[in-house]
Amino acid sequence: MTQLEKACAISFKGEMKMELLEAIRQRHSVRSYLDKPIDTDVRNALCKYIDECNQEGNLHIQLIENEPQAFAKRLYHYGLFSNVKNYIALVGKEDATLNERCGYYGEKIVLKAQMLGLNTCWVGGTYKKI
């Protein structure tokens, strides 16, 4: 078993190891999205996983749906996004471990989204409320 396989087995309890490894290899940043809603079953699976990460990581990660304003303009350092109406906000109380927890659980969610057939793109920073 490779180091990556060992890490995957530990980090993603219950996930099919090969699905996770495939998701890691396939995952890439996407800035242009299809103009269609997230499939209900995919949405439910993603929300369930987000809830698990929130419980485990003491966070308040949220799936924001049907909200096109946040990415309507060009974002400095990231370029132009197209058809972004759904996104995940990584939210938690400010403390010494918040950035680490958001990065760890955010990446777990990004990989779960990839396994569910959703493309993603990390965007960092602090933004005003919409």
Give residue ranges: language-model regions.
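Acidic, surface-exposed loops and disordered segments
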Residues: K6-I130
